[in-house]
Structure formats: C-alpha cells, structure tokens
Amino acid sequence: MIKQRTIAQVVKAIGIGLHKGEKVTITLRPASANTGIVFRRVDLDPVVDFETTPEAVGDTQLCTCLINKDGVRLSTTEHLIAAVAAMGIDNLIVELDSSEVPIMDGSALPFIYLLQKGGIEEQNAAKRFIRIKEKVRIEEGDKWAELEPYDGFHIDFEIAFDHPAINESRQRIGLDITTKSFIEEISRARTFGFMKDIEYMHANNLALGGSMDSAVVLDEFKVLNPNGLRYSDEFVKHKILDCVGDMFMTGHNILGKVTAFKSGHDLNNKLLRKLMATESAWEWATFETPVTMPAPGLELAPA
C-alpha cells in the first residue's frame, strides 16, 4: 500500500517576510493521518488555522494568500506548498508567528531542506491521489490552463514575456514531476520581478522584504543579480514551481497533466476550483501495491 506521510520530527527555520520585511519563525510539526496540510498563525490569540483548499485562496495579487471565514490572512504560502507537494507529504502542521511565510531565497529549495531535515515518516493509512478522468480547461483572454488524464503528473508550461533577458531563455518546458525531478530541475528556480516595480512597491510600503537575496531582479534589459541565473530557463521553471504548489491546494497529489499558457496563481486556482466542481472529471485513487508512474508521493522521498 502507498501510505500517507508526515515528517518524523519538529523542525524550525527563520526568514524574512516578503511583504513586511520582518523576521518570521516557521515551525513544521508532524500531523496524524488524514489531518491534511494545516497552516497555523500562532501570533494571534487564539491561534488561527487555515485549511489547504482551493476555496481558501482569497488573493493572488502579489502571492498566494489564504483567507479564512473571518477575513484573517496568511500570505506567501506558494513555495512551501510546492515543496510539500513535491516531497509527497500529506499531513503537516505549519506554525508561523507572522501573517506571512518567509520568502527565504525566493525558491522552494530552503523548504525542501527543512522537510528533509524533519525526515519522512510513513503512516498507517492509504495515500489518496486525485486522478483526472476527463479534460477541464479555463481561459481568460489569451491565457489558458487545462488538466487532462495522464499516467503520472506532468506539467507543460509556456510563458511569454517581451523582455531581452527572458527572450534569451527557453520559455516552454514539459516535465514529469517527481520528487527527484522537482528537487533537481525546479526547486532552485526563484521568483522574479522588475526593479521599477520593486521600487514602486517599496515606496508604498509593499514587498519590503523583496531584494536580490530573494528574487531574480531585472531592469529593462538584463538580470541585475551579480551571480545571474541558477538555470538558463529559470523564469519558466519558477512558473512550474508555482504551478506544482497551486495544484496541491487540495492537499492531495494529482495524477494528471497540466498544460498552461501565460497562467499564474489566479488562473491555476480557478482551474483547480473548476476541476473539483466537475464531479465527472476526477476520482479518488489509492494504490495497494507500489507503482512506478512519475509523480510525487509514489516513491518514498529521500530524507
């Protein structure tokens, strides 16, 4: 049986919040089977929990922001969720002493390291996947995204930015997403932004933690980071990283293929909501014996 997973021990890290620019402590705790991924703001009294559901995503303007029924917010969850999805973890408590997850270096790699430090522990319950049965598609202008049946988990993503530095890199990638491929090919890809936008946001007390330490920064012509890019196609790879996290907002790994053109957090979330609302388009899947199709959670992630 392919079993559910949590981490084996409590782990902590400290980073800077993207929006407030303040120190944030993140604590990951093991959770019992069938708990799901729960975010908890411990800076509030009483503490406030956020479930990982497509409907919990209430704002995607600058990041993925979870908003509960009382309007309490938790921002910048996307890179951590992508790491959790890639490691095939089903049950986890994420405690934060702030209104945002620390941005770290702008990628998912620090969270991969943190989860690996915690270790992976299998639980005595069957892991439940969401298996796509029929195509679901959503469009907005020239942007679109779709999910369709696939024997594993695959993302085919294309971006289109009219910028010299981005034009020099590959703007479309198709990749089977496994724990190994995510760590090696995707996890180090950082979020990216333009210097003029960062300066504007800083002037308006936004993205105060944003810098070249936590993003790829571009001017009108080039990448400004002294060490350049981590991958030659880092821009589209970060969009895939975001998509991995966005597709895990059910708290379950998907067996299917995502194809997207110029999509982002908002459209990805709308696609996931449409999928879950279309009962004929998906089903729950469990596996009594190990399988070898390419997807996170089908093989035990290296601790």
Swiss-Prot record:
Intrachain S-S bonds: none
The alphabetized UniProt keywords are: Hydrolase, Lipid A biosynthesis, Lipid biosynthesis, Lipid metabolism, Metal-binding, Zinc
In alphabetical order, the GO MF annotations are: metal ion binding; UDP-3-O-acyl-N-acetylglucosamine deacetylase activity
Its recorded reaction(s) are: a UDP-3-O-[(3R)-3-hydroxyacyl]-N-acetyl-alpha-D-glucosamine + H2O = a UDP-3-O-[(3R)-3-hydroxyacyl]-alpha-D-glucosamine + acetate
Give the UniProt entry's GO cellular component terms: membrane
Any GO BP annotation: lipid A biosynthetic process
Q: Where does Zn(2+) bind?
A: 79, 238, 242
Question: Gene3D superfamilies annotated for this entry?
Answer: lpxc deacetylase, domain 1, lpxc deacetylase, domain 2
Cofactor(s) demanded = Zn(2+)
Source organism's superkingdom? Bacteria
Q: Where is the active site?
A: 265
What pathway does this protein act in?
Answer: Glycolipid biosynthesis; lipid IV(A) biosynthesis; lipid IV(A) from (3R)-3-hydroxytetradecanoyl-[acyl-carrier-protein] and UDP-N-acetyl-alpha-D-glucosamine: step 2/6
InterPro entries according to UniProt: Ribosomal_Su5_D2-typ_SF, UDP-acyl_GlcNac_deAcase, UDP-acyl_GlcNac_deAcase_C, UDP-acyl_N-AcGlcN_deAcase_N
Enzyme Commission number(s): 3.5.1.108
Per the entry, what this protein does is: Catalyzes the hydrolysis of UDP-3-O-myristoyl-N-acetylglucosamine to form UDP-3-O-myristoylglucosamine and acetate, the committed step in lipid A biosynthesis.
What family classification does the UniProt entry report for this protein? Belongs to the LpxC family.
Q: What is this protein called?
A: UDP-3-O-acyl-N-acetylglucosamine deacetylase
